[in-house]
Amino acid sequence: MRFHHVGMVVRSVSVANELCLERLKDDAPLVWGPVLAFQCVVAFSEKFPMIEFVVPEAESRLVTFLGGKSVLHHIAFAVEDVRRPAPFSAGDLIFDEPAPAVRGLLVNFLKPFEGLLVEVVQEPVKRVAGNPTSPGSLD
């Protein structure tokens, strides 16, 4: 397990773009993608890939839960297998199945403990060039 990112919920794509440009001095355009299971769109900063911007859809539970505020929402750890997220237990997971997310990630959340929301992230398998069946490769 290793640190992957922090997720910041912001009110809109324009707020995320402004934060990136003005505060992080990252002028690369954010590339947004949907996470349908969580009713939101997300993007990672090019310059600071450890920061994820989350913009919930109007009907998302995040809007009701957070009252429309911009907040630090979660911390995420990369694990080998999101269904068996060692050192955590599968019984600690909120959802029965992981959700597909941007950049080929699979994600799930652990049941909150003392208010801290933790996401577990499984990165896509990379293939070795010239050997499409080999894990750890580059296609």
Enumerate the predicted regions with their spans.
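Vicinal oxygen chelate
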Residues: 2-12, 42-46, 51-53, 63-139
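Amide-forming acyltransferase catalytic core, primarily the GNAT-like/NAT-type
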Residues: 28-36, 40-44, 56-62, 139
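Non-catalytic surface loops within mature trypsin-like serine protease
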Residues: 12, 57, 79-81, 114, ...
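A cross-kingdom feature marking solvent-exposed beta-strand/loop segments within repeated
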Residues: 35-36, 58-64, 71-73, 94-96, ...
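Long, hydrophobic N-terminal alpha-helical segment
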Residues: 1-38
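Loop/turn position at the start of each blade in beta-propeller repeats
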Residues: 1, 38, 70, 103-105
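Generic secondary-structure microfeatures
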Residues: 24, 47-49, 55-58, 79-81
